[in-house]
Amino acid sequence: MRPAHAVIDLDALRHNYRFARRLGGGKALAVVKADAYGHGAVRCAQALEAEVDGFAVACIEEALELRQAGIQAPILLLEGFFEAEELELIAKHNLWTVIASSWQVRALAAFHSPSPIGVWLKLDSGMHRLGLEPKEFRDAWMSLHRLPQVGEIVLMTHLARADELDNPRTNEQASVFAQASQGMVAPASVCNSSGLLGWAGLYSDWGRPGLMLYGVNPIPQESTSLSGPLRPVMMVYSRLIAVHELPAGEPVGYGACFVTERPTRVGVVAMGYADGYPYFAVNGTPLLVDGRVCPLIGRVSMDMLTVDLTDHPQADVGSQVQLWGVQPGVAELAAHCNLSAYQLLCGLKRVRRYYLGEMGAV
């Protein structure tokens, strides 16, 4: 069996959720969209359900996957509904929905729900993606308040630059949100992972931790000391499947983008860009071979990559290779490849997942 696999530490996931909730000081929605950022949404939700305040997903398909797996906790649709017909499923499966536009308010007003639907009313405070404009926000809130088919309303917005601690945009967005929601008696949700980790002065009744749940700080590490308590959740491993001894002056891999400058031991690892390892990883990107840092050499191919073992003579066929996890961390590897940690985690494919404390793989 091909040795490439990921180990998901569910204890670390629970630890990170508790830390996020403590930081926020209120409740916290565990964001498990995009298959829990590549970690497996169902298994992650099952691990958190006993203590979670709720989950957040992108769309109704992701929510239904959790419901079909037996998850009973509240689930919020972060993108809301795309068609009015989806309200039937939202009501049937007891989902919460974001309302981010006036047509959604009208659709909900025309829908006769058998039970009240929880609504998160979203303000566009300056990200200019989803959300009602400030001038529409109060009228939408008042309209929803009058509807018997609407349950609790949470007021929310999304921060665009909270990962930049010296940028004034976060405070500007918070001010827009405070002004637009002034006098509205309702819980508020402002902070995503960056907001929770970097902006202690911003209070949310509901936090929305996403990337930090999986042990990754979205803020550059030198900018905050709060990443320390986070524990990595995903460790990606493979093994050496071949070792070659090359003289100086030999090209390695497609395009000869690496040429040996000395006699070199080259290890071949069963992991490539089809598995989710970054195609654009540069020479020198660190990997851990039997616990020792070794540099990537040559271009990453579809199914394999190559590593310099010259200074690690004990490494041989069968040696374990950690692609990311504790060392290198997800953020470190992403920086080497000019990617975001989000891309790296969500792009993991064709790799078996094992869950610590559980049997079997997905």
UniProtKB/Swiss-Prot annotation:
Positions of the catalytic residues: K33, Y254
Pathway in which the depicted protein is active: Amino-acid biosynthesis; D-alanine biosynthesis; D-alanine from L-alanine: step 1/1
Top enzyme category: isomerase
Any one Gene Ontology BP term: D-alanine biosynthetic process
Keyword Isomerase: yes
GO molecular function: alanine racemase activity; pyridoxal phosphate binding
Enzyme Commission (EC) number: 5.1.1.1
Catalysed reaction, written as an equation: L-alanine = D-alanine
Cofactor(s) needed for function: pyridoxal 5'-phosphate
A family per Pfam: Ala_racemase_N
Cellular component terms per the entry's GO annotation: cytosol
Keywords, ordered alphabetically: Isomerase, Pyridoxal phosphate
Family label: Belongs to the alanine racemase family.
Task performed by this protein: Catalyzes the interconversion of L-alanine and D-alanine. May also act on other amino acids.
Full protein name: Alanine racemase
Organism name: Xylella fastidiosa (strain 9a5c)
Phylogenetic placement of the source organism: Bacteria, Pseudomonadati, Pseudomonadota, Gammaproteobacteria, Lysobacterales
